[in-house]
C-alpha cells in the first residue's frame, strides 16, 4: 500500500493537532512549560479572554495533558493551578521545535525572545531527529516512511 492509499482518519499528526493544534492552546502549553500555573497568570501573560482560556484549560485537563492542583491564598477561595502531566510533558519536544523554527524563520529582529539553555552546562538546547542506532541528527532525505500496521486503506469514493 502506498501513502496516498492510506486513510488519514487515524493519523497521529491529525490526532495531535485535534488536541493541541490551536494557537491559544499552544501558547498555554508554552507558558505551562515555563511554570506558569495560575489562571490569572495565563490570562495576563497570553492576553486572551476568560471564556477562551477556561475552554482551552478545560480541554487540556480533559485530554490528560494538564491536571489541576487546588491552592488557596489567605483570605481567598480555593482555586486550581494547572500543571503538566506526563502526557503533557511529552509535548516538550514539539514546543521546543516550534520555538526553534520560529527563532530561525520568524524571528524578532532584536534577537531571541526566549533563551533556552541546559541548566547544568549553560549551552543552548536544540531539537533534532535522531536514529535509534549509532547515527546522529538526520535530515528528511535520510529517512524513509512507509505505512505501519495501523494503516487503513482509503475508502473508495462513492460513485457519482
Set out the residue ranges of the language-model regions.
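Long, low-complexity, charged/polar intrinsically disordered regions in eukaryotic proteins
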Residues: 1-8
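N-terminal helix-turn-helix DNA-binding core of bacterial DNA-binding proteins
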Residues: 11-52
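Basic, amphipathic "hinge/linker" alpha-helix immediately C-terminal to the N-terminal HTH DNA-binding motif
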Residues: 21, 73-95
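C-terminal regulatory/oligomerization modules of transcriptional regulators
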Residues: 96, 100-160
Amino acid at each position: 500500500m502506498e501513502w496516498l492509499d492510506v486513510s488519514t482518519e487515524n493519523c497521529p499528526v491529525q490526532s495531535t493537532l485535534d488536541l493541541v493544534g490551536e494557537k491559544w492552546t499552544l501558547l498555554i502549553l508554552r507558558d505551562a512549560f515555563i511554570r506558569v500555573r495560575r489562571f490569572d497568570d495565563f490570562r495576563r501573560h497570553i492576553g486572551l479572554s476568560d471564556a477562551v482560556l477556561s475552554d482551552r484549560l478545560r480541554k487540556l485537563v480533559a485530554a490528560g495533558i494538564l491536571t489541576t492542583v487546588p491552592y488557596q491564598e489567605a483570605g481567598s477561595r480555593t482555586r486550581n493551578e494547572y500543571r503538566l502531566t506526563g502526557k503533557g510533558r511529552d509535548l516538550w519536544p514539539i514546543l521546543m521545535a516550534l520555538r526553534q523554527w520560529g527563532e530561525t524563520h520568524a524571528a524578532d529582529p532584536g534577537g531571541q525572545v526566549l533563551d533556552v539553555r541546559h541548566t547544568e552546562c549553560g549551552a543552548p538546547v536544540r531539537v533534532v531527529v535522531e536514529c535509534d542506532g549509532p547515527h546522529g541528527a538526520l535530515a528528511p532525505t535520510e529517512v524513509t516512511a512507509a505505512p505501519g500496521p495501523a494503516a487503513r486503506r482509503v475508502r473508495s469514493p462513492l460513485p457519482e
